Amino acid sequence: MPFDPSTLKYDAAGLIPAIAQDAATGEVLMMAWMNAQAVARTLESGRVTYWSRSRQSFWVKGESSGHVQELVDFRVDCDRDCLLVTVRQTGPACHTNRRSCFYTAVREGEEVELMAPLL
């Protein structure tokens, strides 16, 4: 059956969360937002495209930094309200220059930094 981005469940702002996962390691890299057009652009181009809520514009991951996300697989969850994009990540995924945006853990009530920025 052909995929139609309009069949996804978007929030009131027309957005859906998209979790990026490294295709080789399974590591969760980041979470960002997509709208229907970002979904379509991602599937058409093979380059993961998000919607920047702060800039109110499309954000092709790595367009300015070179830290691109090449789409490997695109999955829809059971409620159709969240996406999982598995990617080939070039360089760090996080704007803090870390491999993953999930670099802080809470352990025994304390925040622990799990990874330092890449050089």
From Swiss-Prot:
Residues engaged in binding Zn(2+): 78, 94, 101
Annotated gene: hisI
Membrane-spanning residues: none
InterPro entries on file: PRA-CH, PRib_AMP_CycHydrolase_dom, PRib_AMP_CycHydrolase_sf
Keyword set includes Repeat: no
Function per UniProt: Catalyzes the hydrolysis of the adenine ring of phosphoribosyl-AMP.
Main location: cytoplasm
Top-rank EC class of the record's enzyme: hydrolase
Gene3D superfamilies in UniProt: Phosphoribosyl-AMP cyclohydrolase
Keyword Chloroplast among record annotations: no
HAMAP family: HisI
Natural source organism: Ruegeria pomeroyi (strain ATCC 700808 / DSM 15171 / DSS-3)
Binding site residues for Mg(2+): 77, 79, 81
Cofactor dependence: Mg(2+); Zn(2+)
Catalytic activity: 1-(5-phospho-beta-D-ribosyl)-5'-AMP + H2O = 1-(5-phospho-beta-D-ribosyl)-5-[(5-phospho-beta-D-ribosylamino)methylideneamino]imidazole-4-carboxamide
Alphabetical list of PANTHER family matching this protein: HISTIDINE BIOSYNTHESIS BIFUNCTIONAL PROTEIN, HISTIDINE BIOSYNTHESIS BIFUNCTIONAL PROTEIN HIS7
Stated family: Belongs to the PRA-CH family.
Annotated compartments: Cytoplasm
GO molecular function: magnesium ion binding; phosphoribosyl-AMP cyclohydrolase activity; zinc ion binding
Assembly behavior: Homodimer.
UniProt keyword annotations, A-Z: Amino-acid biosynthesis, Cytoplasm, Histidine biosynthesis, Hydrolase, Magnesium, Metal-binding, Zinc
Record-level GO cellular component terms: cytoplasm
Protein name listed in UniProt: Phosphoribosyl-AMP cyclohydrolase
Pathway: Amino-acid biosynthesis; L-histidine biosynthesis; L-histidine from 5-phospho-alpha-D-ribose 1-diphosphate: step 3/9
Cofactor note: Binds 1 Mg(2+) ion per subunit. Binds 1 zinc ion per subunit.
The protein's Enzyme Commission number: 3.5.4.19
GO term, biological process aspect, one: L-histidine biosynthetic process
